[in-house]
């Protein structure tokens, strides 16, 4: 679905704002880890707080670009993005690195590409489960773990309510998951 900014300089600005805020968020979380490791808890906390602010800014711009859909659409978009990363992006990066004399980096790009391939497969499997109503019910016995308290249940269906912490599956759909 196209957004109202399609083809405009404003759309490019929104994309750049989203990208910049997203990168800043990651950088600040990396910086927080270093500050914490060096014993600067207050500085680490400030980096993390700012990273959370940057996340909200990125979300705001991404929403303007109509980048957030329902779970089905989000799984499809995520799978497509991962496909691009492993089939085109990282392979292209690897070839360039080889041509420029960086074989170790080329190998690393390809290894990350393999991880992205796994990510795509996982998203496509989740999408299939969603489309076939097999998110909380499987055709064979599975181990289910409550994401809230860790209680384990074995069966073909996740419990609607965790018998330990009373979390409702319908209230927090992703709180119960199949372990296998």
Located regions from the model:
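Conserved small/polar residues in nucleotide/adenosyl-binding loops
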Residues: 168-173
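Short cysteine-rich clusters marking metal-coordination/redox-active sites
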Residues: 146, 162-165
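Alpha-helical bundle segments that constitute or directly flank the non-heme di-iron/ferroxidase center
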Residues: 9-38, 46-60, 73-99
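A broadly conserved sequence feature marking short terminus-proximal activation segments
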Residues: 89-152
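N-terminal leader/targeting segments
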Residues: 2-5, 9
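Short linker/helix segments within small regulatory modules
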Residues: 154-158
């Amino acid at each position: 679905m196209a957004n109202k900014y399609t083809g405009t300089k404003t759309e490019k600005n929104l994309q750049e704002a989203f990208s910049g805020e997203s990168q800043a968020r990651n950088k600040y979380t990396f910086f927080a880890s270093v500050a914490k490791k060096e014993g600067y808890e207050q500085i680490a906390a400030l980096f993390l707080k700012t990273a959370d602010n940057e996340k909200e800014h990125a979300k705001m711009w991404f929403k303007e670009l109509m980048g957030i859909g329902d779970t089905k659409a989000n799984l499809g978009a995520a799978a497509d993005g991962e496909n691009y990363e492993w089939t085109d992006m990282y392979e292209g990066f690897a070839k360039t690195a080889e041509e420029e004399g960086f074989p170790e980096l080329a190998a690393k790009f390809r290894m990350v590409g393999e991880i992205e391939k796994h990510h795509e497969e996982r998203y496509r499997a989740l999408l299939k489960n969603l489309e076939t109503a097999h998110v909380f019910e499987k055709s064979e016995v599975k181990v289910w773990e409550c994401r809230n308290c860790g209680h384990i249940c074995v069966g073909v269906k996740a419990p609607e309510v965790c018998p330990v912490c009373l979390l409702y599956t319908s209230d927090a759909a992703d709180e119960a998951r199949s372990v296998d």
